Amino acid sequence: MTTAQQLAMKGCHNFRAGIWKPRTKPGGFEGNGEKALPWLQRVKKETGMLVSTEVATPEHVELALKYDIDILWVGARTSANPFAMQALADSLQGVDVPVFVKNPVNPDLELWIGALERINQAGVKRLGAIHRGFSSYDKKIYRNMPMWQIPIELKRRIPSLPIICDPSHIGGRRELIAPLCQQAMDLGFEGLIVESHCSPDEAWSDAKQQVTPDVLDYILSLLVIRDEKTTVEGIQTLRKQIDELDNELMNLLAKRMRVCREIGQYKKEHNMTVLQTNRYNEILEKRGAQGALCGLSAKSVASIFEEIHEESVRQQLEIINQ
């Protein structure tokens, strides 16, 4: 209650708490279950905030609705399982409650969209998505890799879908929350879900990624909220330049692929394999060096030429197998 009261005083409108917490391994804190639902009722009554919790089974849905939980969300482990999602969707038939769906643990946009569609087809119209990052072996900086291109593509495909960001789970460390919050706002996310605790180091789960209500209030006060819809003449001129450059790029790629097909024909006539590893490594090395001189990241350059090479191989295989 102390945390809830402090957050309400800071102007927060929605209090989210995990009643059931699926853990990667057994033995950790997995939530207090049904006995904690009256605690959320008390938060709602005493602070006026809306309350929300995660549901993973039809039984969770039934109990959450029984205790008048205002908003439900589906966690990353559940959204990755179509069987679990369909069971949740069936339990939500005819229920008028907002539902947010977190991205699956693995970076699979179609799986995320499928989870959202199942809930929507159950008749839930107040639907949103939560971006909490994606699991990766590389945890040098983030607990979960942001991979911003995936929620951006989700927004492109479903423009009306509200998407909020969970910087706590992406960062995994409290010092990363502020910059991640700002990046989410810069990308046009509709909101944030940030973990807070009156005594973060004493939290029963994910203590390292929690901040006090005072720190949260300070982080939010520093956010720069940009106007997505404001367009000035200057940016339209620059966008026209981008369009012209993109046209040039497409023409150059088409020309490159024509040469690749000629190479494919040569390989066929001389009984050569399509994949020439030494040549591919040479291209990556040279283009990476060129990219660095042009101010491009090595990762971006490698990614671009990996895609180009994949398309080249595909077209050459077609020629060889004709």
Residue spans for each PLM region:
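Glycine-rich anion/phosphate-binding loops
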Residues: 1-5, 35-38, 175-178
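Catalytic domains of carbohydrate-active enzymes, especially glycoside hydrolases
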Residues: 2-18
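Non-catalytic positions within long, well-ordered alpha-helices that form the structural scaffold/packing
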Residues: 5-8, 65, 120, 185
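Catalytic beta/alpha-barrel core
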Residues: 16, 30-32, 49-57, 70-84, ...
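Glycine-rich, proline-tolerant flexible connector loops at the mouths of alpha/beta enzymes
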Residues: 16-35, 198-207, 263-272
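Catalytic alpha/beta core domains of metabolic enzymes, predominantly
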Residues: 84-218, 222, 227-233
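Domain-level signature for soluble enzymes in the chorismate/prephenate branch of the shikimate pathway
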Residues: 228-322
